[in-house]
Amino acid sequence: MRHFAPIASILLSGLVPSALAAGDHPRVHFETDKGEIVIELDKALAPKTVENFLSYVDSGFYEGTIFHRVIKGFMIQGGGLTGNMQQKKTNAPVVNEADNGLKNLRGTIAMARTQEPNSATSQFFINTVDNQFLDFKSKTPGGWGYCVFGKVVEGMETVDAIENLPTTSKGMYSDVPATPVAIRRAFVETGDS
C-alpha cells in the first residue's frame, strides 16, 4: 500500500498540466443554423474578457441571438440581437484588454464595442481576414483597438458560409443576413462534450 501513494502521485502529476492548460484555454461550441463553430479562448492573455464571455455562455444568453452584421472580406458579428432585431439586456461593460498582444487575424474572435474603448458587453465578431487596423496601438480613444480573446479552432467553413450570405437592411441595421443565422446552442466543452 505504501507503494501506491508514489505511483498515484506520478499518475496524477501527469494529469495536472493538461487540466491547467485546458483551464487557460477553454473551448466554446456555437451550434448555428449554418453549422458548428468551436472557439478556443485565451484566459491567460484576456482573463476579464474570457470571464465576461463565459458568463454569457453559461447563462444561455447567446442562444437565440443572431449574426446580425456580416461584411464580406471583414468579419461576422453576433451576440446581442434576437431574430426580430431586438437588443438583449446585457451585463455591465468589461474593461478593454486589447493591449494583450493578441492580433485581429483571420479566425480570431474579438469583442465588439462602441467608440468608447471600455464599452464591450456581449457582442463579439470573428475576423474573416487579417484586420491589423483593429489592433491595439495606444491607450488613447483612437488607438485602443478591439480585444482579441480567442480563435476558431474548428468550423471556419461555417464562418465563411455566414460571411458569404446575401445581406440586406433591417430597420436601423445594415449588413444583416437576408436569411437569419441564429446561435441555437452555446456551451463550454467538457470531457463529456
What are these regions, as identified by a protein language model?
Residues 1-4:
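Positively charged n-region of N-terminal signal peptides that target proteins for export
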Residues 18-193:
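Cyclophilin-like peptidyl-prolyl cis-trans isomerases
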